Every structure is written in C-alpha cells, then in structure tokens.
Amino acid sequence: MAGSSRRAGGRRLQLPLLCLLLQGATAILFAVFVRYNHETDAALWHWGNHSNPDNEFYFRYPSFQDVHTMIFVGFGFLMAFLQRYGFSSVGFTFLLAAFALQWSTLVQGFLHTFHGGHIHIGVESMINADFCAGAVLISFGAILGKTGPAQLLLMALLEVVLFGLNEFVLLSLLGVKDAGGSMTIHTFGAYFGLVLSRVLYRPQLEKSKHRQSSVYHSDLFAMIGTIFLWIFWPSFNSAPTPLGDGQHRTALNTYYSLTASTLSTFALSALVGRDGRLDMVHVQNAALAGGVVVGTSAEMMLTPFGALAAGFLAGTVSTLGFKFFTPILESKFKIQDTCGVHNLHGMPGVLGALLGVLVAGLATHDSYGEGLESVFPLIAEGQRSSTSQALHQLFGLFVTLIFASVGGGLGGLLLRLPFLDSPPDSQCYEDQIYWEVPEEHADLAQGSLRPEEPDTQA
C-alpha cells in the first residue's frame, strides 16, 4: 500500500510540474527569440507592396491542414487499437504533439531560420514542426502502454533536439533530398523508438500480455486513423516540396504507391493468414507503407510505374514483418515493439532511403530538363554528379541510423531514472492508471489489475 501511495503521489505531481516547467521555459524562449517572418508580419508584408494572393499561406496552408490532421487524428487513432488504452493512445498523442510543436519550432528555428538574433516563423515552420512531431509519435508507438506521461514528455524533449540536428546535417550540410521524410521522419523515429524500447525492456511484461490485444471496436477506431493517414499522405509528402511540378509529382507518386501497398497488404495478409483470413493489424498498418517508402523519392522522376512497384514492395515487406519479424524482435532481440513501428516505418523507411539512392543516381539533365535545378540543385550547378548525389543520399541513411540509435539509447537511460513514474509490469496498457474512466471500464479493469509490483526493466 505504501508503494501504491508513493506512485499515486508521483503521478499527481510529476505531470503538472513538468507541463508547467516546459510550457514556462518554452514561452520565455518564444518571447525572447521568436518573431513573425516577412510573410506574417503586417508591417513587412505591406511595406513590400505585395498582393495578398501571393502570400505563401494560400499555397501551403491546405497542405498544412492535411498534415495537422494526420498528426492529431491519424496517429492518435491508429494507436487506439489496444482494448484498454484508447484514452492514453489518443490523449498522450495530443499532449506529446502539442509540446513537440512548440519545442521543434525553437530547435528547427535556431538551425534554419535564425538571423538578426531572432527565429522567424511562418506557415512553413508549422509544417516542419508537424513533421518533427510525427517522428516523436512514431517513437511513442514503439513504447506505447509501457511509460508514463512524464517519461514521454522527457523523451520528446530529447528527441526533438536530435531530430533537428539530424535533419540539419542531412538537408543543409549533406544536401540530401528527403521531402517526405523516409529518413528524417520514419527511419529516425522508428529506430529511436526501437532502441528506446530495448533499453526499457521488461522481462515480466507477460503480466500485462492479456491487455496487449484489440477488441472489435478498438480495431475500428484504429482503422479510422488508417483511413485519415491514407487519404492525406500525398499532402504529407508534398507539403515541403517546391510549388509547381515538384509538388504535383510528389502527390501523384505517393497516391499510386499507397494504392499498390494496399493491394499487396490484402494479398499477403490472406496468403499468410489462418485459413486465408485477413488480419486487421496488417490492413491498419502495412497499407500505409506505400506512403513511407516514397518519402525520399516522390519528388524525383520516380515514374508512375516506379511508384506502384515501390508501394507493392513496401506493403509486402511490412505485412511479412508483422507476421514473422515482430515475434523475433521480442524473443531474440528483447525489443517490445507495441505498434510494430519497425514494420510500418523502420523497414519501409530504409527501403525508401535506398530507393532515393537509386533514383538520384539515375538523374540526368535530359530526364529533368530545367526542373533539375529545383530537385537536385547541386547537380544542376555542376557541383555534384548523379553518382555523388546518390552516395550522399546513402551516407544520409547511415547518419540517420546513428543519430537514432545513440539518441534512443540516451533516451532510454533518461526514462529509466528511478524517480520517474511508470506503470508496473502488471498494469501496462491500462488507461485507469492515468485517467478517470467510465464505470463499466473501471469494473472490467479492476478484475484484471494485480497488486502493484516493482518494475522489472532490465
């Protein structure tokens, strides 16, 4: 009972104090450093005698709306498949993303838009912050149900910094192309989360295994998340690309890649399923792999056929990963990947990076014409050959894996600090620990909750 009281006291204090501390610090930094850019500042915009329809808002905000919906609705409901963790899946997604948006605005601002002593923000800053939040939520998926909200906020605090540094190295220093984030978002977020999960490994998690499954209605909620993500993914990949043919091509390639990954998912799920039955886990996740795999190459001249082939391959690999590789990750590598982020984001992200290497290596002036300057400016300017660009793309993948692995290890050590509240092994994947729940849920939960025991992270 004493241990239970101490845990309850920690929950009562840790989250409020950390939220207030982080929000207060962020607000001070915003007051000191953050300013509107020339397209959002009233004086600067009108001083330039610009026409309002020329403002970037009108071109970027529709894409931002789609990306924003993906982050808060798509990711949140996709992770709501656990039978007793729906409040936490959607609610902690809301909390993490809200903090990550503010913190990443500062981190990315210092790295990309800092001049004259200030960070200058506009609609593009909002899109980039959403991308960073997406990486954080991917990592959250790997440890879903096994951590407390205070731990998750500290994870986001560290991960946003490392995401920003990795993105800066790849895009600004190495000149890597990765508009849809196969490397910077999906690969980074997945392997950060997987290494984090390994450091937080719980040998006695079997005590909560009965809750690590879905019920009929929770799978339907997760499918809502899938549909939102699937519909808006072309906007996600095309949001940061140059306006015009580049953005058009990116949306088109993503669109067809998603259709192919969906068909391959249904085909493989029935093929490997018991009695030829479809598995909702496969459909919820692997059907989205087509959006991940073309994240790097969608703005390139991938060709419609290439988009279909990439999507079909990604859906196949992802489905087989859920069926065969996820159990091996836990039994052999001690990685407890709750949402299967390795199958949806990790492997398709790496495949997407390698596809980018291939397509970049094939880039020529004949195939791109004057458009080469917007897609591969260093090749167009004669500073690089296509082969050199391809090698830089490959090196960018290795850099991302290093950042993710080291960052995940550091994050795991941070989250293992003994004073941080986390659910005991017997109470993982349970909303009632952190939320007021309806009485019928509480009655069901009480029957399965066991007395609190010490954590067994090894």
Curated annotation (Swiss-Prot):
Write out the GO MF terms. ammonium channel activity; ankyrin binding; carbon dioxide transmembrane transporter activity
Extract the ranges annotated as region (Interaction with ANK3): 416-424
Q: What is this protein called?
A: Ammonium transporter Rh type B
Keyword tags = Ammonia transport, Cell membrane, Glycoprotein, Membrane, Transmembrane, Transmembrane helix, Transport
Q: Can you quote a single GO CC term?
A: spectrin-associated cytoskeleton
Q: Which family does it belong to?
A: Belongs to the ammonium transporter (TC 2.A.49) family. Rh subfamily.
Give the record's PTM text: N-glycosylated.
Q: Which residues are on the Cytoplasmic side of the membrane?
A: 1-13, 83-86, 146-149, 202-219, 273-282, 326-346, 415-458
Function recorded in the entry: Ammonium transporter involved in the maintenance of acid-base homeostasis. Transports ammonium and its related derivative methylammonium across the basolateral plasma membrane of epithelial cells likely contributing to renal transepithelial ammonia transport and ammonia metabolism. May transport either NH4(+) or NH3 ammonia species predominantly mediating an electrogenic NH4(+) transport. May act as a CO2 channel providing for renal acid secretion.
Query: Which species does this protein come from?
Result: Sus scrofa (Pig)
What's an example Gene Ontology biological process for this entry?
A: ammonium transmembrane transport
Glycosylation sites noted in the Swiss-Prot or TrEMBL record? N49
Q: Which reaction does this chain catalyze?
A: NH4(+)(in) = NH4(+)(out); methylamine(out) = methylamine(in); CO2(out) = CO2(in)
Q: Where in the cell is it found?
A: Cell membrane; Basolateral cell membrane
| Stretches in topological domain Extracellular | 35-61, 108-124, 171-178, 241-251, 304, 368-393
Q: Which residues cross the membrane?
A: 14-34, 62-82, 87-107, 125-145, 150-170, 179-201, 220-240, 252-272, 283-303, 305-325, 347-367, 394-414
Domain of life, per the record?
Eukaryota
Membrane topology (UniProt): Multi-pass membrane protein
